[in-house]
Amino acid sequence: MKFGISIPVTIGEKWKEKLLECLPQIEEYGFSSLLVWDHYMLPEKYGVKSNNTIDAWTLLSFIAANTTKIKLGTCVTPIPFRPPQLLAKIVSSLDNISNGRVILGVGAGWHKPEFDAYSSWDNNKIRFEKTAEGLELMKKLWTEDVVNFNGKH
């Protein structure tokens, strides 16, 4: 059995120093993975202001630079939130930087205000279609030298 740890993308006073203090312990204690939330905004009930979050993939790059063995990834990255070809580049870049330590958790997204602010909101059916199509394109971009792709979305 493997155990992972999840941390939020919220930032506050001395967040970098606190995180840097914890990272060696996380690896030392034998956690197999460290996952972060992939959100730019959180529901108000969580008590986090939008300007107190950091981009998940930027945070993971910071963590990769300060760790050596723990797997890194997102709890859930909503595929419809970003263009899939951009997400494929972001993920493969981090995988390269971290020497193959990336885990990509995916989903269709759920927080409408976040999509409204940073992307575009679609109904569940469309978001699930975009997720499946985006994954198909991303896999091709990672495994084929030349990609021709004509998706519905």
Residue ranges and their predicted role:
Residues 1-11, 69, 110-115, 152:
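N-terminal small/glycine-rich loop or linker at the start of catalytic domains
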Residues 1-66:
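N-terminal beta1-alpha1-beta2 module of alpha/beta enzyme domains
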Residues 3-7, 34-36, 71-74, 102-106:
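Hydrophobic faces of well-ordered beta-strands that scaffold small-molecule active sites
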Residues 5-17, 75-85, 121:
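Active-site mouth loops of central-metabolism enzymes
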Residues 29, 65-70, 137, 141-145:
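A structural motif corresponding to the C-terminal end of an alpha-helix
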Residues 39, 78, 108:
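Residue-level "edge-of-site" marker
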Residues 42-47, 83-153:
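Internal, glycine-rich beta/alpha segment that forms the wall or movable "lid"
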Residues 61-65, 71-80:
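Structural motif corresponding to the early beta-alpha repeats
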